[in-house]
């Protein structure tokens, strides 16, 4: 199965973890970058396109600025990123250039992908670079980013880039051999799982509670990235990037690392964008009847099923749809603002125009703009 899947892959997103790229965290691991360049050249010779999602800018800049340990403030981190980006790209340019490959830097914030026009423009730029044989190196724009427009981590960014680039495979290079059934650093009997057919609640528990910021070898965010990529119909391959030749071994059919199969029912591009790229602005709370209809029948959300609205948002915003117990059941783009929904909630669709004096449609959220989670 693995060989058949990898044989069809033409466009790959490779996410490089900071521990792999910075080694002892005293700067960039130049030996790793040289190996990556050689293995990427081999993939290119096989007719595959490669996109790199890279950490390392802050670590590289921190050393240049003489900052010991992690930056103690956001301005320090952003200053380190500003100087580190050029150092990082110089390293990629030198090592990839030895194989005749050009690299290009793309810095993104969540806003760039949440805006549909900028999202499509970024996709066109990626396609053009790949058509010219250039290897894009993507990172979050740490120099200007604030909490409101952060991706959160580069694992999440790599999953969103997989959608953006319409890639066929996400590769996550980390510093452990793959996904284990428990923390291999705490449990010497932890078992490496080579194939994950579906990411279930049990899988998430093995990685650590999904609501926690820590997990099995940093596995929580990596598992979330694999799940997001899988919902777009893309498999994820998790490999130990500290092992020389690991990409070559994987694409030669060796059973290394962990392969996560994609979801059986994948989301289309727009719904994946709604579910994972847009930042929700508020919450729409629905009754049990609406919850059942949304979850099981894939219907639109009508005002009659809404019991209250939380937060302030305009028409066209993304919101969380939650049950009366507070559990999130869906996300969607609303056809009415929070103020309008407050006036029409609990009413039939036929009453909307009489209440508001106008009508955008029968639905609070049309099913084409609604993603059940």
UniProtKB/Swiss-Prot annotation:
Record's keyword terms, sorted: Amino-acid biosynthesis, ATP-binding, Cytoplasm, Kinase, Nucleotide-binding, Proline biosynthesis, Transferase
Single Gene Ontology BP annotation: L-proline biosynthetic process
Enzyme class at the top of the EC tree: transferase
Assigned GO CC terms: cytosol
SUPFAM superfamilies associated with the record: Carbamate kinase-like, PUA domain-like
Catalytic activity, reaction form: L-glutamate + ATP = L-glutamyl 5-phosphate + ADP
Chain positions recorded as substrate binding sites: 55, 142, 154
Residues at which ATP binds: 15, 174-175, 216-222
Principal localisation: cytoplasm
Functional pathway: Amino-acid biosynthesis; L-proline biosynthesis; L-glutamate 5-semialdehyde from L-glutamate: step 1/2
Pfam family membership, one: AA_kinase
EC number(s) on file: 2.7.2.11
Superkingdom assignment: Bacteria
SMART domains: PUA
A GO molecular-function annotation: RNA binding
Subcellular location as annotated: Cytoplasm
Domain called PUA: residue spans: 281-359
Family classification: Belongs to the glutamate 5-kinase family.
Free-text function comment from the UniProt entry: Catalyzes the transfer of a phosphate group to glutamate to form L-glutamate 5-phosphate.
Protein name: Glutamate 5-kinase
Organism annotation: Geobacter metallireducens (strain ATCC 53774 / DSM 7210 / GS-15)
